[in-house]
């Protein structure tokens, strides 16, 4: 799947990196490159939803990043 949105830091403590799409859907990023760990950047991410992965953040579906493009 390919989704477009804005990177945000979510949660308490160390937090987690998330992609918030233009329609408001939030995905927790898995295996995000350091370049993606910048709050407020607009990106297009290609990846797959990992239904077999649970996290402490529980902010949305886990999106395993396969590739990305800064917009």
Predicted regions and their residues:
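Structural detector for short beta-strands of small beta-barrel domains
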Residues: 1-13, 46-47
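Well-ordered beta-strand positions in beta-sheet-rich domains
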Residues: 2-4, 26, 62
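Short, structured beta-strand/loop micro-motifs enriched in basic residues and often containing a Trp
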Residues: 21-28
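Short solvent-exposed loop/turn micro-motifs enriched in small/polar/acidic residues
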Residues: 10-12, 28, 61
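Short aromatic-glycine-enriched beta-strand elements
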Residues: 13-19
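OB-fold/S1-family single-stranded nucleic acid-binding modules
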Residues: 52-71
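Short connector loops at helix/strand junctions that flank enzyme active sites
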Residues: 22, 38-42, 58-63
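Short nucleic-acid-contacting surface segments enriched for D/E, G, S/T with interspersed K/R
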Residues: 32-46
């Amino acid at each position: 799947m390919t989704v477009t949105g804005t990177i945000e830091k979510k949660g308490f403590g160390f937090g987690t990196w998330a992609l918030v799409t233009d329609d408001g859907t939030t995905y927790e990023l898995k295996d995000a490159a350091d370049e993606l760990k910048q709050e407020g950047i607009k990106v297009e991410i290609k990846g797959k939803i990992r239904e077999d992965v649970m996290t402490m953040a529980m902010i949305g579906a886990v999106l395993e990043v396969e590739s990305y493009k800064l917009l």
